[in-house]
A protein has these predicted regions:
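Forkhead-associated
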Residues: 4-6, 10-70
């Protein structure tokens, strides 16, 4: 399964396999983006059979999916 992440007008295609991916600014994240709006550990993407669950990890600016806050 593949998703697209938008950050500062750029788009990043991410393939999600089993397990959880952490997105954020920290080098400890699976996906690191140097966007000042992102928290060090911003959100988690977890694949669940035929869908992806996005969980905000207490980020300062929130996490949005198709313009809607989650």
């Amino acid at each position: 399964m593949k998703i697209v992440v938008s950050s500062e007008g750029r788009y990043l295609s991410i393939r999600i396999t089993d397990g959880t991916l952490i997105i954020g600014r920290s080098s400890s994240c699976n996906v690191t983006l140097q966007d000042p709006i992102l928290s060090r550990q911003h959100c988690a993407l977890t694949r669940d059979v035929d869908r992806v669950i996005c969980t905000d990890l207490g980020s300062s600016n929130g996490t949005f999916l198709d313009g809607e806050s989650i």
